[in-house]
Amino acid sequence: MDYNLALDTALNRLHTEGRYRTFIDIERRKGAFPKAMWRKPDGSEKEITVWCGNDYLGMGQHPVVLGAMHEALDSTGAGSGGTRNISGTTLYHKRLEAELADLHGKEAALVFSSAYIANDATLSTLPQLIPGLVIVSDKLNHASMIEGIRRSGTEKHIFKHNDLDDLRRILTSIGKDRPILVAFESVYSMDGDFGRIEEICDIADEFGALKYIDEVHAVGMYGPRGGGVAERDGLMDRIDIINGTLGKAYGVFGGYIAASSKMCDAVRSYAPGFIFSTSLPPVVAAGAAASVRHLKGDVELREKHQTQARILKMRLKGLGLPIIDHGSHIVPVHVGDPVHCKMISDMLLEHFGIYVQPINFPTVPRGTERLRFTPSPVHDSGMIDHLVKAMDVLWQHCALNRAEVVA
């Protein structure tokens, strides 16, 4: 068996289809976000503006967060020293979980090494805890949810994205006598559309189903205290399990679930992804807790974030660019093929100092390739002007279609 030949075949297929992924070597600079330094393959450096990061609010640079991390580092050192069960639970972890439980109005929270692991571990474990559990999942749920459900081996059904009639049809076919969990998201990251939380809860409640929501692209950014779209809409108490991240709006690292004390205790006790993973370093837990605590009160930062997203959408729409606008902070621009998508991304970086990663299959379906911009409160008007002008030039250069602009 020629193993290298098999690997070459797989990699060459990606190159041929124009969707081979390259890593851009960048260095974030303290206090300069969204500016960063790009180290080119030849070793030279160029200052760029990051337009595709997940540090949605710039909290990864916030003095409150950095101060908490410096204090914890000086106090405890680098790593946690173990799993949560064996010497790896510290005061910092307990404080963070208390902040998260309070954020979502739940009895408890459980911190994982990432939101991916939190989804995967929880969804793969629940069918072991609840015999006969059937999971009903939105078609566009994140890969971590899909993988967790797959690994559980339980009976599963997929309903059409945000389609309430299809959800009801599936639940009716399962019946009211079986345990059911309905899994969905609040903000779907590739299109930026919102999950139909209230209506899904209404239908799920008719069948006595548990509700599991992924708020990864919403926590910190929506709701009076940053509890997500469910908080914004006054629906947190109707959700049984909330999944979130500490690596996007909160600007640090890690993931979690928030739920009842009994639910968190059961997952803590049975999920291999929690039990056998080294816990977050105390310095990370301290920074995350400080960020969560700060954003509970920083309404102005959230409002500015939404304002910048609206401005960017309006400016790009004014050029006739095909924006996918569902009202969230995510700004996808539809390109429609992987070659042009990567070409525009490369030219933005090389010629304009603008970094946005192309989004290609399998992250999105073929023919829906896009550039996905994530404006933040610290992307100022000059940066927006520069981006809009660059997109205008490159869209014309690539002879891509524009929509008619109504005056």
From Swiss-Prot:
Its cofactor is pyridoxal 5'-phosphate. Keywords: Acyltransferase, Heme biosynthesis, Pyridoxal phosphate, Transferase. It comes from Cereibacter sphaeroides (strain ATCC 17023 / DSM 158 / JCM 6121 / CCUG 31486 / LMG 2827 / NBRC 12203 / NCIMB 8253 / ATH 2.4.1.) (Rhodobacter sphaeroides). Transmembrane segments: none annotated. One of its GO terms (molecular function) is 5-aminolevulinate synthase activity. Pyridoxal 5'-phosphate binds at S189, H217, T245, S277, T278. Belongs to the class-II pyridoxal-phosphate-dependent aminotransferase family. Homodimer. PANTHER family: 2-AMINO-3-KETOBUTYRATE COENZYME A LIGASE, MITOCHONDRIAL, CLASS II AMINOTRANSFERASE/8-AMINO-7-OXONONANOATE SYNTHASE. Substrate binds at R21, S137, K156, T363. InterPro entries: 4pyrrol_synth_NH2levulA_synth (IPR010961), Aminotrans_II_pyridoxalP_BS (IPR001917), Aminotransferase_I/II_large (IPR004839), AON_synthase_class-II (IPR050087), PyrdxlP-dep_Trfase (IPR015424), PyrdxlP-dep_Trfase_major (IPR015421), PyrdxlP-dep_Trfase_small (IPR015422). It is an enzyme of class 2 (transferase). Pathway: Porphyrin-containing compound metabolism; protoporphyrin-IX biosynthesis; 5-aminolevulinate from glycine: step 1/1. It catalyses: succinyl-CoA + glycine + H(+) = 5-aminolevulinate + CO2 + CoA. The modification N6-(pyridoxal phosphate)lysine is found at K248. The gene is hemA. GO terms for biological process: protoporphyrinogen IX biosynthetic process. This is 5-aminolevulinate synthase 1. Its EC number is 2.3.1.37. The active site is at K248.
